[in-house]
Every structure is written in structure tokens, then in C-alpha cells.
Amino acid sequence: MEELNIDFDVFKKRIELLYSKYNEFEGSPNSLLFVLGSSNAENPYQKTTILHNWLLSYEFPATLIALVPGKVIIITSSAKAKHLQKAIDLFKDPESKITLELWQRNNKEPELNKKLFDDVIALINSAGKTVGIPEKDSYQGKFMTEWNPVWEAAVKENEFNVIDISLGLSKVWEVKDVNEQAFLSVSSKGSDKFMDLLSNEMVRAVDEELKITNAKLSDKIENKIDDVKFLKQLSPDLSALCPPNYKFNFDLLDWTYSPIIQSGKKFDLRVSARSTNDQLYGNGCILASCGIRYNNYCSNITRTFLIDPSEEMANNYDFLLTLQKEIVTNILKPGRTPKEVYESVIEYIEKTKPELVPNFTKNIGSLIGLEFRDSNFILNVKNDYRKIQRGDCFNISFGFNNLKDSQSANNYALQLADTVQIPLDETEPPRFLTNYTKAKSQISFYFNNEEEDNNKKKSSPATKVPSKPDRNSKILRTKLRGEARGGAEDAQKEQIRKENQKKLHEKLEKNGLLRFSAADANGPDSEPRQYFKKYESYVRDSQLPTNIRDLRIHVDWKSQTIILPIYGRPVPFHINSYKNGSKNEEGEYTYLRLNFNSPGSSGGISKKVEELPYEESADNQFVRSITLRSKDGDRMSETFKQIADLKKEATKREQERKALADVVQQDKLIENKTGRTKRLDQIFVRPNPDTKRVPSTVFIHENGIRFQSPLRTDSRIDILFSNIKNLIFQSCKGELIVVIHIHLKNPILMGKKKIQDVQFYREASDMSVDETGGGRRGQSRFRRYGDEDELEQEQEERRKRAALDKEFKYFADAIAEASNGLLTVENTFRDLGFQGVPNRSAVFCMPTTDCLVQLIEPPFLVINLEEVEICILERVQFGLKNFDMVFVYKDFNKPVTHINTVPIESLDFLKQWLTDMDIPYTVSTINLNWATIMKSLQDDPYQFFLDGGWNFLATGSDDEASDESEEEVSEYEASEDDVSDESAFSEDEEGSEVDDDISGDESEDYTGDESEEGEDWDELEKKAARADRGANFRD
């Protein structure tokens, strides 16, 4: 059992403090009662949870604590009681006023638990009728299910006067001791570090005009708490602030709340604010808030970043800084009430800038510690019943909202928040625990001047149309069979696209150097990140199988162990230590050689292997191999086969474990028990958890959706809103089904299968389709209706499809609405789609607002465009009718995505679409070896970008190099072999189309002197096709 690091001296000191103070609580309770059910990660600031953290530094679920005169009773499980056993001796001291009793409950004996509950209620009743509890606490779980009926009955029977003790508890843990102040310093330093990361990401997004929402930028920062490499970089600064005898542990770092980023024209300065799904607005001001907690002690920091501010905004920000200094230095004094503090702040504003008084926040912060916002100690005009004391720690948070800039007429807001400690020493002034820069020069950024200068420099060349591409464009248009486009307007668009791509490539290279450093290298010279996974066959001798007494080789499948008889004793070898073996027969003996993992065997362990097969140490001794012989050949053969099968099974199990390593256990779905649950009936799901395909139902609940199969109650799929990355609706227009597609952030398990996409669909039409082309003649025997009936049938089908689209679109919108802003519905744009082969078969790919998708034929394709680093268009060369697309992701560990065999007619459109989506692309005439490219990129990404990044490809795609290659191609003269090859390729597909093209549209395009240019490619192809057909007839 893992040993918990509980400081029992602190536990005794604090529980005695609580015992000595509770008689002074409002309402004079005779006893205190704290009941904690299951842990609630959604609300970690309930009073009982805070009490556990204050006393033990841990939360003990399913535990009851009662304080009655002379004793403290704790009812908990036997496993948790073992951790608290040491505390009992501390309370046996004769000077101690109370004793501690541990009562152990048992989940399997509800009658015993009820007796314990009755006994503790009897003690409470004997203490008096007034019982103090935290009334607003609300817990769930089996423990609460057992306790609540007993307590409710006892309250009625004994006529208990139950009172709320939240205010009294707030006063008990208000003053922070030295250790608590140290924990607050650690958490505050963590907030500084994450604010620095947030500001860098925010400034980069504004500077590069990235299309990112406030919420997505917030999620990006929030996910950094799971980045072990980043946390290790913070460790030296944070560990120096820890209390003596407390070792820093970055696993104790967590978010107080999700980072809040606000931009645009609407701002919320309350602590309950959330990041919106609006685009990050890089003008005016951006408010950013971070809160980190360490060992459950909270901190908070808020900064205002000014983007191209006017003089009025800058002056008001200067006043904000002055006001903060005034509050902390001169107003926040021990002995004053929050009402006096707030009124003093208002007086100062009225004296200095009276026009800002209506815009000032209704409070200037609150007490902070184990509770992020103590509602019983808010610094506002209503709080006249508390007084500031030495040792208090405050989140000083205030600002001005709904300000209007006279220059731009835009709304803006200013806000500052810092964690401030009032020291225990009277000679020391209040101390800022959060120290991230707030100086105006450091938080102000100016971009407009630079952009205006750049626009002036680039305005003249941007409108200039070069003459050289104009000549080549005609040739290119003919060879690729695209639509006829010409003139200066098309050439100008092409030039603009090239310039935009050039900027995107420059930005890509610049970002690469910013994202990576030399420390990110993971090449052959870097230190391998390898580890050893411990294993154990048996803990005690009694666990060995009973049949080992025959001193034969045994294979214990249950313990994954080979048991060998050595010197008359069974010696276990875990299958993980076994490498390979061999079996040979020599004379009457059969020899079995077993080789084990050991240092130095087979040239050592490759650096590519992450998991070491053994733990190398100077103290360890290894067995390299063991050879056994026996006259019982059949027995040895059977044993060798069992060992081989056990090794295969262990290897397979380990591969499955690694494959499912990225599967995240979702939180529990909270069912909607109030109001009407929205549902969508008669739908099918892909993939299907059942073997049979039957219509089912999907429900919308409080924090997610649930697909429920009618076949079995346990056959269902729960998807939380927080795990949905993309919610996509695809109409049945042009398709046989209507679809709501859900692409997940983290895969979930369906049985033993890992899935990242879940799709709900319904077939759009159940009508039979006549594919014979015979009309009524083909089925006159069965169909007697005329054209009017057929027309009415078609109209009815259109109505059904429209109603189906409306029903599914309404349900998709309902999912987005229930997510409280986490999700938005994306629609597919069929008009922008194109054919391609992302897997094995040709499908129709379509873009949405943020993705490129294929949702009709499994396996589905969902490419998030914001995750794409670059797109490479491969096999783009003269004479080929299709090309390939390769998407490289910003996460270089993620495999690239191929979409093959895209028609060449889509090339120009896709180039423009990629440019519009701010995705740089390059063009290659060949298929590249992506395994080699990505391997070099992963080994040392910093050196990759230092050497020019993606410039090793055809940078800018449509650059001058491609133009020159086109000129060379235009002088190509076809040989007989080449012509016959091309005609053979196109004969079946284009035979009749070539004639139509030459006699129709193509002839109208060429109004110049064709005698100088000679026959074009289509004409040569046509002749070759006729020649081949003639040769076939002769044959």
C-alpha cells in the first residue's frame, strides 16, 4: 500500500485548534459533523473537502468526522484507517484535551455500518441538540446513500437544530502559518510561469494573425499542465520555495480554474468568467487570468495586455497600476473591515479619476488559500463582520469594465489581479506572491505601424502582373485540361496567391525556430529515454503452485512464470525475463536451452527501444541461459511449446497495452434527471457496439450524450462534451444517409477496440430505385401509374430528405447548446469537395469550417486544419491525370495523412483553398519518402528549421522553378513509344471525349497562329488512339 505523507503533528495541532474554537461559532454548536462521500473533481472547494486537505493534505472519500465534547471520531474504511493509526498515540498525551477514535466500516456489511452511524448519532445527541455542519456541501456515492436516510431520520427523531458553520470554519483556517505561506508562494510562482507561457502564445497568435478562438488558446495553455518536460523545467524555481523538509512534487500542481482569455468588445471581470469561442481579437485589450494550486493551496493572477492602445487606454492603465499600489501599500491594513477597505478605494478613485467610479468592480477580491474564493470574506461594501488579520492571504482582483475608447469608439476593459500575503511579522509590509510583469512597457504591443509600412512597400509590386507566366498559363491550361481561364485578372490572382504562400512559408520557418530549441534534439547522440518496467512472479512462497513438488519444469499461466527445478528447489522466472529458446535432440536425451535477457547479449539494447527488458545495475546478477535435458522427449516438447505460447501471449498483451496507451478514462456521464431529455430516435451508429444492426436512440444529458442500444441495457456509448473535438453535421444532399459525426479528443474503448470517431446516421430513402433505364416499359406488368405519379414520388422524397436534414441539424444544434459553449456545429461544404483516395477506395472529401472530412465510407477521415503544418502536393507533372496530397501535422510524432489519386482538375482549386485556410503548400513531381523525412525531423526539429525547414522542397509551390519546368515541357516532342503509352492509358476513359473536346471547346480557345505551335498534346493523343484502335482491328 502506498504510504501517504501525512504530517501528524500538524494534524494534531489543527484538529485541537478546531476543537477549541467551535464553541465560539455562530449559533454555538454542541458538536460538529463532516460527512464526505465520493470525491467531486468538479467542485474541489466544498468545506468538508477543504477540512480534509487542511488536516491531512489529502481527501479521504467515504469518511465521517465528528467532534463531540472530549473526543474526535473518524469513521472510515480499514484501508484508510491504517494511514491514520499513528495519530491515535499522539492524542494519548495526558495534556491533550481530546482523544481520537477510529471506527472501521465495511462495504460488505451494511448492518455494521448502520450500527456505527447509530452510535455516532447517539454521541452527538448526548452532546446537545445543536449540530454544526457545512450546509452547502453536497456529495454523492454509496457512502452517502447509506448515511443520508439514517441522518434524516435521526434529525426528526431527536429534533436536532442543524446550523451552518461555514463562517466559523472560514475564521479557523483564515490565518496562514509558515508552511501554508510557503505552499502559497509555490503556487503563485507556478501562476507566474503559466502566465508567461500564456502571454507568449497570445502575442504570437496576434502577431502572426493566427485564426484561433479564446477558448482554444485557453485549452492549449491548460493542457501544458500534463507536459512533464515543461513541468520539470519549472521544478528548480518552485522547489526552492517549498517549506523545509517538504520535497517538491510537480504531481501536486493543478489548475485552480481553466485559464481565462477575453478579447473583443465584451468582458466579464467576475471570477466565474469563462473563455469564449470568439476569435482572438488582436486589437484594444486582451484580459488573461491564470490560477495554479499546489498541494491544494490556490493562487491567482490576471494581466491586461494592450494591443495598439490609444493614449486614453494607456493613461487609464497607468491609473490601474497606481490604484493597485495604493490598495496594497496604504489601504489593506490589519484591523480594518472589508467594507472600510472598499470604501477607501472608492474615495481614492473619486478624488483622482471620478469618471471611472461607475465602471469599477463591485469588489476588490477575497480571501484565498485552500479555498479559491472564500464567500465569507469578500472585500466589498457589504462585508462589515470580518477584520483583516496578520497571516491573511488575499486575491486582490479589481478593474474597470465597459469603458469606451474615444478614439476608436470601441468598448474595452482593464483588470489586474495578484495574490498578496499579509506577513505575520508586524514590521513587514504586504508582499506580492505573484510577480509577473505588469509594467505598461512590458504588456503593450504595437503592430499597426509595422503593417502600414509593409503595406506601403508592397503595394506597388502586388498589383504588377508579370508577362512570363501569362504565356505559360495558356500551355498549362491546355495540358491539364482545366477550364479556360486567362487574362490579366487570373494572372493577378495567381500572383497574389504566390505572395501569400511566400508569407506563409516565411512564417512557418520563423515559427519552427520559435517552437523548438537545441534541447529538443532526440538524435543518435542524445541520451535515450529508456526505462525498466518492474515485474514480479510471486510475493510469498505460498503462492507457488502445489504441483511443483515433482521437480519438473512447469509453466504457470496465471502468474506468467516459468518454474525450473534447480538443485531440488523450484526457481521462478517471469516470462518478461525470458528472451528465446531452442530444443534439440541428441541420442536418447532432449535438450532444452532457455535464454534470458541480460546485459551484453546480442550486442546490447538498441536506443530505439524505450522499455528495457532488464534493470541494469552493479548490484544485479544475471542468468544468461539455462540448459536442461531429459529422456522424456514428449514432455520437453510440450513444455517448450507452452513456454513459446506464453511468450507470444505476453508479447501480444504488451502490444495491446501500448496500442491503448492513449485511451483516456472519461468522467462519469451525469444523467439529466430534471426536465425533458432531448433524444433522437431511429438512428444507427458506426462503429456499432452490437453485432446486429438495429435502430437505436441517442440522448443528450448534462455533461454529454449517450447512445443506448435496445438489445442490451449495458450496450451503450457515453461521450462527454469535454472529450468532443469536432461536431460535424452532413446533409443527405447527394448522399444516401444523413450524418452527425463526432470526432473525439481522446480515443475511447468499445469492447476491446479503440475508437476516435463515432457517427450517428439514418438512411435518407427507403424507396426502391429503377436502375434498368426501361421506365414503365420494363415494369409495365407491375406499375400502372403515369409521369404525374413519378413526379409526385420524387417530390415526396425531396420533402423527406429536407425533413431529415432539419431533424438531424436541430439535434446537432441541441448538442452544441447543451455543451454550454464548448462545441459548435460544423457543416460540410459539398460545393468545395473533391474526389480522392485517403484509404483504399475513392471517396468524396469535403471541407468544413475547421476540418477536411470524409464521413460516408469507413474508415472515416477527419483532418483538423489548425493542426496541419504543411501540405505537399505530390506527383504533379505533365501528362498525369491525378496527383497526391500529403498533410504533415504540427505534432511531428503524428503520422502524415495521404489523400491519393486526386483529379488534376482540382489542383488549382485546392491551391487556392489551402491558401485561403492559411496552410502553406509545396508541389513535388515525385512521391517522397515520408518515413525518412519525419524521422530526421523528430530527431532534431530545431536543426531542421535552422537548415531552412521545408525549403528543401519546392518552396512556394508555384515559384519560378515550376515555370521554367513548364517551358522545358512545352518543347517536348513525343516519340512513338511515348504516344502509344499515353494513348493506351486514356483510350478507354476518354475515347469519345477527345473528339468532342477538339471539335468543340478546345478549338475555340486557340485563335492564334497554330501553324507555329504545331499540333497540341490532345491532337497527338487522338491520333495515337485511332492508330491503336486500327492496330487492334488488324490483329
UniProtKB/Swiss-Prot annotation:
Subcellular location, principal: nucleus
Keywords annotated in UniProt: Activator, Chromosome, Coiled coil, DNA damage, DNA repair, DNA replication, Nucleus, Phosphoprotein, Repressor, Transcription, Transcription regulation
Listed CDD domains: CDC68-like (cd01091)
Residues the record lists as Phosphoserine modifications: 526, 765
Residue spans of biased composition, Acidic residues class: 957-1019
GO CC, alphabetical: chromatin; FACT complex
Location(s), subcellular: Nucleus; Chromosome
Known outcome of mutating residue 836 to D: In cdc68-1; induces a spt phenotype characterized by depletion of many mRNAs
Region described as Disordered: 448-496, 768-796, 956-1035
Domain of life: Eukaryota
Coiled coil, from the record: 208-234, 636-666, 959-983
GO BP, sorted A to Z: chromatin organization; DNA repair; DNA-templated DNA replication; nucleosome assembly; nucleosome organization; positive regulation of RNA polymerase II transcription preinitiation complex assembly; positive regulation of transcription initiation by RNA polymerase II; regulation of chromatin organization
InterPro entries: Creatin/AminoP/Spt16_N, Creatinase/aminopeptidase-like, FACT-SPT16_Nlobe, Fact-SPT16_PH, FACT_SPT16_C, FACT_SPT16_M, Pept_M24, PH-like_dom_sf
Gene3D superfamilies the UniProt entry points to: 2.30.29.150, Creatinase/methionine aminopeptidase superfamily, Creatinase/prolidase N-terminal domain, FACT complex subunit Spt16p/Cdc68p, Pleckstrin-homology domain (PH domain)/Phosphotyrosine-binding domain (PTB)
Entries under SUPFAM superfamilies matching the protein: Creatinase/aminopeptidase (SSF55920)
Pfam families in the record: FACT-Spt16_Nlob, Peptidase_M24, PH_SPT16, Rttp106-like_middle, SPT16, SPT16_C
Amino acid composition bias (Basic and acidic residues), ranges on this chain: 480-496, 1020-1035
PANTHER family, sorted: CDC68 RELATED, FACT COMPLEX SUBUNIT SPT16
Misc note: Present with 18500 molecules/cell in log phase SD medium.
Function: Component of the FACT complex, a general chromatin factor that acts to reorganize nucleosomes. The FACT complex is involved in multiple processes that require DNA as a template such as mRNA elongation, DNA replication and DNA repair. During transcription elongation the FACT complex acts as a histone chaperone that both destabilizes and restores nucleosomal structure.
Entry similarity comment: Belongs to the peptidase M24 family. SPT16 subfamily.
Quaternary structure, from the entry: Forms a stable heterodimer with POB3. The SPT16-POB3 dimer weakly associates with multiple molecules of NHP6 (NHP6A or NHP6B) to form the FACT (yFACT or SNP) complex. The FACT complex interacts with the CK2 (casein kinase II) complex subunits CKA1, CKA2, CKB1 and CKB2 and the components of the transcription machinery CHD1, CTR9, PAF1 and CDC73. The FACT complex interacts with the PAF1 complex. Interacts with POL1. Interacts with SAS3. Interacts with YTA7.
Name under which the protein is recorded: FACT complex subunit SPT16
